[in-house]
Amino acid sequence: RRVLIAQFLKDGRSGELAALKTFERATVYPAKPISGFVFAMTAAQKEEAAKQQNAQAADIQGEAEGLRPALTVLDELNVALACGMVTRENAERLIDAALAFGDVVSTGRNAPEWLRERADYVSEIVARKHPFQTEKLAAREGIEY
């Protein structure tokens, strides 16, 4: 059985990608890099990033339809929806396509209610303590990316 793992809002260099690519039955669709954090983008950068992320959602939908995975993991889709980088319509099309073949996992904070009702799994990791908060450390190579 096949697994499709697709990322949103990441730069394609995250540490989990290397590990995931070692799994024979997993197809990894890395995020198309966006320039910086959404909260720090100009209006023009947000518009361009949203176009790119919506196009990526359509590409992932096509990948799911071709691969027919038993499990599709949509990493950070919840965040992409919450910050307006992916439209509800595009997310629904992607989720529906993936659900036709198996289960769907959608990760990230702020999942909208409609997605929580629709997806098979919705997960969110909450940082109770993190050096970013306590020591004002930036993301570190080998740890956060």
Regions found by a protein language model. Give the residues of each.
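Conserved ATP-binding/catalytic motifs of P-loop helicase motor domains
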Residues: 6, 104, 131
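Sensor-1/coupling segment of RecA-like P-loop NTPase cores
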Residues: 94-112
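Phosphate-binding/switch region of NTP-binding enzymes
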Residues: 109-145
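Phosphate-binding/switch loop-helix module in NTP-utilizing enzymes
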Residues: 40-100
